C-alpha cells in the first residue's frame, strides 16, 4: 500500500501553491454539509468529518465560519454530488468527484477536459470497481505497533497500518473514520498529518515519460475545474 500513500503525498506537496483553490473547494463542501443538517459539528456527523479533513489542509477559520454562516442564513444554493469515471493514456484510470449547482455545465467541462488532454470519459462503473473507498490517516510520534495496540484495545479492526519514513499510515473502512480518529486522539495523537477519504487503486501502473506528461496535464485540467473536488487515479507518478 505504500504507493497509495504516495498519492496522498502528491496532493499534500501541491497544497502550498493551490491554497486558494483548496480553500474554495472546502468552503463549498462545508456549506453543503452544514446545509444538510444542523450547522453544528457536534450534532452533524457529516459536517464534523469535513471539518476534520479541512484541519489537515490548514483551512482558515474565517473560511469555515463563512461557509457555516451561509448555511445558517440566506444561502439557498443546492449542490449535487457527482462522480465521473474515465481513462487516460495506456491503461490509466481516473475517478473525478464533483460538487455542483449546474449538472450540465459540470458534465460538459469534465468531458472537455478529458477530450482535450488525451483521455476519454467512461460509463458509470467502468473504473470504480478497480478502486477501494478508504479512510486514511497519517500520524507522527506513534509507531505501527503502538497504533495497532491502540486500535486492538478499542476492538477496531482496520485494513492495514504501515510505516512510511517515520509517518504511521492507517487504512480503514470509510465508516470507521470517526472511530479510528477518536481512538488515536485518546491515545495522545494531537495532530493528524492526513485525515482523508480516498478512492485507492487496487493495482498501480507505471507510464512512460511521454505518457506521464500527458496524464499529468489531464489531472491538472480536471483539478482546475471549479466544480471538481477530487481526482483519484491508478498511476504511480515518478
From Swiss-Prot:
Species in which this protein is naturally found: Staphylococcus epidermidis (strain ATCC 35984 / DSM 28319 / BCRC 17069 / CCUG 31568 / BM 3577 / RP62A)
Cellular component GO terms held in the UniProt record: cytosol
Protein family according to the UniProt entry: Belongs to the TACO1 family. YeeN subfamily.
Alphabetized InterPro entries for the sequence: Integrase-like_N, TACO1_YebC-like_2nd/3rd_dom, TACO1_YebC_N, Transcrip_reg_TACO1-like, Transcrip_reg_TACO1-like_dom3, Transcrip_reg_TACO1_YeeN, YebC-like
Protein name in the entry: Probable transcriptional regulatory protein SERP0322
Main location: cytoplasm
GO process terms (BP): regulation of DNA-templated transcription
Keywords, in A-Z order: Cytoplasm, DNA-binding, Transcription, Transcription regulation
SUPFAM superfamilies reported in the protein's UniProt record: YebC-like (SSF75625)
Amino acid at each position: 500500500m505504500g504507493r497509495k500513500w504516495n498519492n496522498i503525498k502528491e496532493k499534500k506537496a501541491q497544497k502550498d501553491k493551490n491554497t486558494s483553490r483548496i480553500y474554495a473547494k472546502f468552503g463549498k463542501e462545508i456549506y453543503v454539509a452544514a446545509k444538510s443538517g444542523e450547522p453544528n459539528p457536534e450534532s452533524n456527523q457529516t459536517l464534523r468529518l469535513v471539518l476534520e479533513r479541512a484541519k489537515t489542509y490548514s483551512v482558515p477559520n474565517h473560511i469555515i465560519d463563512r461557509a457555516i454562516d451561509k448555511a445558517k442564513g440566506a444561502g439557498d444554493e443546492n449542490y449535487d454530488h457527482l462522480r465521473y469515471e474515465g481513462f487516460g493514456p495506456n491503461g490509466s484510470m481516473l475517478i473525478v468527484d464533483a460538487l455542483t449547482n449546474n449538472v450540465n455545465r459540470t458534465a460538459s467541462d469534465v468531458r472537455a477536459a478529458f477530450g482535450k488532454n488525451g483521455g476519454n470519459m467512461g460509463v458509470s462503473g467502468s473504473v470504480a470497481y478497480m478502486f477501494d473507498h478508504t479512510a486514511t490517516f497519517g500520524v507522527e510520534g506513534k509507531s505501527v505497533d503502538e497504533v495497532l495496540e491502540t486500535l486492538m484495545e478499542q476492538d477496531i479492526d482496520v485494513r492495514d497500518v504501515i510505516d512510511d519514513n517515520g509517518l504511521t499510515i492507517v487504512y480503514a473502512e470509510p465508516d470507521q473514520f470517526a472511530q479510528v480518529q477518536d481512538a488515536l486522539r485518546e491515545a495522545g495523537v494531537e495532530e493528524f498529518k492526513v485525515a482523508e477519504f480516498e478512492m485507492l487503486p487496487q493495482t498501480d501502473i507505471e507510464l512512460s515519460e511521454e505518457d506521464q506528461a500527458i496524464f499529468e496535464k489531464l489531472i491538472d485540467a480536471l483539478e482546475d475545474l471549479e466544480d471538481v473536488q477530487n481526482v483519484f487515479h491508478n498511476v504511480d507518478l515518478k
